[in-house]
UniProtKB/Swiss-Prot annotation:
CDD domains: GATase1_IGP_Synthase. The lineage of its organism: Bacteria, Pseudomonadati, Campylobacterota, Epsilonproteobacteria, Campylobacterales. The keyword Hydrolase applies. Heterodimer of HisH and HisF. This is Imidazole glycerol phosphate synthase subunit HisH. Pathway: Amino-acid biosynthesis; L-histidine biosynthesis; L-histidine from 5-phospho-alpha-D-ribose 1-diphosphate: step 5/9. GO terms for biological process: L-histidine biosynthetic process. IGPS catalyzes the conversion of PRFAR and glutamine to IGP, AICAR and glutamate. The HisH subunit catalyzes the hydrolysis of glutamine to glutamate and ammonia as part of the synthesis of IGP and AICAR. The resulting ammonia molecule is channeled to the active site of HisF. One of its GO terms (molecular function) is glutaminase activity. The gene is hisH. The active site is at residues 79, 186, 188. The keyword Translocase does not apply.
């Protein structure tokens, strides 16, 4: 069973619908005490980093998600959910994250991007795998995923980087370390390729 963390922010219904499409048993969970009952967990999210962390703390989900990660079961962050896995973000100030991955979240650097690039990045972009992973099983190199974001991750450990994309310059588009992984793009909005990623996640372990 896949648990989708409900902390009053995020694209919960679209993630649930995508999981149902790939044949997974899944449900939205708002009770922190129940997270460990699930085989795997998805942390979705849209909006501002600081607000999201505040919701996680107030709902009691922060400690529950950290406990789940320690259990060794698969945990997947999507979009803002991926960003929350890192140590901190510089979105509208400086905010501490969950600290499950080493690195930080920064805004796209307009001085490096050149002309013609709008922020947020919104639309399809190519994904370049940086290492092998069960999450990418059955996918050919250079596939496209759907992105909506103004900030991106900078990982301290190169070996944690699962994939990169280019928007003016290369940035981390997916991360994976042990049982914790994240995608900056939205698999649930990325048609067959995105559904394959979610299916792969459901088959890990």
């Amino acid at each position: 069973m896949v648990g989708i963390v409900n902390y009053n922010i995020g694209n919960l219904a679209s993630v649930l619908n995508a999981l149902v499409k790939v044949g997974a048993k899944a449900q939205i969970e708002k009770e922190p005490s129940r997270l460990l009952e699930y085989d795997r967990l998805i942390l979705p999210g849209v909006g501002a980093f600081g607000d999201a962390m505040e919701h996680l703390v107030q709902s009691g989900m922060k400690e529950a998600v950290l406990e789940f990660a320690k259990s060794g079961k698969p945990l997947l962050g999507i979009c803002l959910g991926m960003q929350l896995l890192f140590e901190k973000s510089y979105e509208f100030g400086e905010h501490a994250g969950l600290g499950l991955l080493e690195g930080e979240i920064i805004p796209f650097d307009k001085t490096r991007m050149g002309e013609g690039y709008k922020i947020p990045q919104m639309g399809w972009n190519r994904f370049y795998a940086k290492k092998k992973s069960p999450l990418l099983k059955g996918l050919e190199e250079g596939f496209y995923l759907y992105y909506v974001h103004s900030f991106h991750a900078v990982a301290k450990r190169e070996e944690d980087v699962l994939g990169e994309s280019v928007y003016g310059y290369p940035f981390v588009s997916a991360i994976e370390r042990d049982n914790v992984a994240g995608f900056q793009p939205h698999p649930e909005k990325s048609h067959d390729v995105g559904l394959r990623i979610l299916k792969n996640f459901c088959e890990i372990g």
